[in-house]
């Protein structure tokens, strides 16, 4: 799973908590650091990942934040999938596992390789 965060001062801490939770359930996470949402989608394709999570307040005021989540390339979670995630979270229906964290910035140089 590709994970990134926006520029707000609190987003990185939220991303770290998200990553810890994902790893504890067996997800392998590739942290691409400070990013724009389109960069996370770009990294999903170029790093061949099945899912993304972007910690961002998007267009909201400072103090608000959320997580844009996507599965399958180019698709974000639909309301039904978000309801399922909410149910899993509120009812603590987590699976246990041991995921791996990788920190990667290779997605940043990929666009320049196509410039002639």
Which residue ranges define each predicted feature?
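Short intrinsically disordered, low-complexity coil segments enriched in acidic
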Residues: 1-6, 107-116
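Ferredoxin-reductase
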Residues: 1-73
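Gly/Ser/Thr-enriched, mixed-charge loops and adjacent short helices
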Residues: 65-108, 114
